[in-house]
Amino acid sequence: MLLETGLERDRARPGAAAVCTLGGTREIPLCAGCDQHILDRFILKALDRHWHSKCLKCSDCHTPLAERCFSRGESVYCKDDFFKRFGTKCAACQLGIPPTQVVRRAQDFVYHLHCFACVVCKRQLATGDEFYLMEDSRLVCKADYETAKQREAEATAKRPRTTITAKQLETLKSAYNTSPKPARHVREQLSSETGLDMRVVQVWFQNRRAKEKRLKKDAGRQRWGQYFRNMKRSRGGSKSDKDSVQEGQDSDAEVSFPDEPSLAEMGPANGLYGSLGEPTQALGRPSGALGNFSLEHGGLAGPEQYRELRPGSPYGVPPSPAAPQSLPGPQPLLSSLVYPDTSLGLVPSGAPGGPPPMRVLAGNGPSSDLSTGSSGGYPDFPASPASWLDEVDHAQF
């Protein structure tokens, strides 16, 4: 608040200190500074109070105020002290800035000319200079700022690793078991006991808590992962059981050949197999055998066991298992022979006195003539099949 003092002139007559009248009295004013009657020729008036000319002074510098003063509350100040105390303050030195002084501004901060300088090199910044304004209103020139950033990056990259001894580690673990998140005074006590820095102690507790949390999470993940694996295995086991049952049904169904034509139907239309009137057992697969039993191009493949076709044959073998009773469909009229050497083909023998037998080619091997007049069996065949393949039609029975 700006107040201007006025000089009041006492116009009372000389020698008359007070004039008493019937209607009232006129008193001599008292000084607000010294609390005495003002008998001077001139009286100063400020803040609606009267002052001696020597009593009206600045509250800070005690300079007598004769023409103009500034007040705040019950105190009176000169112009300089008033702006120093209540005016705009410099962001660097925190002192008031008079309104007549030249200043510099950086965003919302105001500086004295001599305070507008770099805090590192103390160089006063001029108009056009590049600088960085810190959060605490300090100024740093561009060169010093970039140098400080480079040093900080190098120090961060070359930061030495802290080594904790076994005794220090035992002390920290004991404190962690007591409280995983200790208070500040506990960390200070641990720092003094172990000789480690406060920051090191704080980081150790943070890392320890993070490790415990990670271990708990991993344990839960393993537990749930094992549970889901067991569930998947159980579901896979039940599915495999169903598949095995289905495969068993398919395997049983593959034994019968309801859609396969008989050899009589497959043979030539000359009535060669028409004299075979007695049906034989159907082709069957031994229990537990793997793979499918197929009949292709009139040939019988696979190392299976069948009945002997004629008495006195040197190739007699035990009878094959009976075919399933529940399988429908026509049964083939011809059985086959099996030999230790699976590479040999199969040739059925005809009835005595009948036409010469036809050659039946196996699905996966060469043809062979099994109806020879030899009584010794396999040693009578030549070493090479090519030498006897063409002699099958001229074999003697």
UniProtKB/Swiss-Prot annotation:
Gene3D superfamilies: Cysteine Rich Protein (2.10.110.10), Homeodomain-like (1.10.10.60)
Coiled coil: none
A GO term from the CC aspect: chromatin
DNA-binding region: 157-216
Family matches, as SUPFAM superfamilies: Glucocorticoid receptor-like (DNA-binding domain), Homeodomain-like
Location, primary (coarse class): nucleus
Biological process per Gene Ontology, one example term: animal organ morphogenesis
Region Disordered, annotated ranges: 212-397
SMART domains xref list: HOX, LIM
Any one Pfam family match given in the protein's UniProt record, by short name: Homeodomain
PTM annotation (Phosphotyrosine): residues: Y227
Cystine pairs: none
Protein localization: Nucleus
Domain called LIM zinc-binding: residue spans: 31-81, 90-144
Residue positions where Phosphoserine is found in the record: S71, S234, S238
GO molecular function: DNA-binding transcription activator activity, RNA polymerase II-specific; DNA-binding transcription factor activity, RNA polymerase II-specific; RNA polymerase II cis-regulatory region sequence-specific DNA binding; RNA polymerase II transcription regulatory region sequence-specific DNA binding; RNA polymerase II-specific DNA-binding transcription factor binding; sequence-specific DNA binding; transcription coactivator binding; zinc ion binding
Phosphothreonine: modified positions: T63
Biased composition regions of type Pro residues, renumbered to the chain: 316-331
Top-level taxonomic group: Eukaryota
The protein's assembly and partners: Interacts with POU1F1. At neuronal promoters, interacts with LDB1, in motor neurons LDB1 is displaced by ISL1 and a ternary complex is formed in which ISL1 contacts both LHX3 and LDB1; allosteric structural changes in the DNA binding domain of LHX3, induced by the ISL1-LHX3 interaction, may explain differences in sequence specificity of the different complexes. Interacts with LDB2. May interact with CITED2/MRG1.
Purpose of the protein: Transcription factor. Recognizes and binds to the consensus sequence motif 5'-AATTAATTA-3' in the regulatory elements of target genes, such as glycoprotein hormones alpha chain CGA and visual system homeobox CHX10, positively modulating transcription; transcription can be co-activated by LDB2. Synergistically enhances transcription from the prolactin promoter in cooperation with POU1F1/Pit-1. Required for the establishment of the specialized cells of the pituitary gland and the nervous system. Involved in the development of interneurons and motor neurons in cooperation with LDB1 and ISL1.
Domain comment in the entry: The LIM domain specifically interacts with the Pit-1 POU domain and is required for synergistic interactions with Pit-1, but not for basal transcriptional activation events.
Xref: PANTHER family: LIM/HOMEOBOX PROTEIN LHX, LIM_HOMEOBOX PROTEIN LHX3
Protein name in UniProt: LIM/homeobox protein Lhx3
Source species: Homo sapiens (Human)
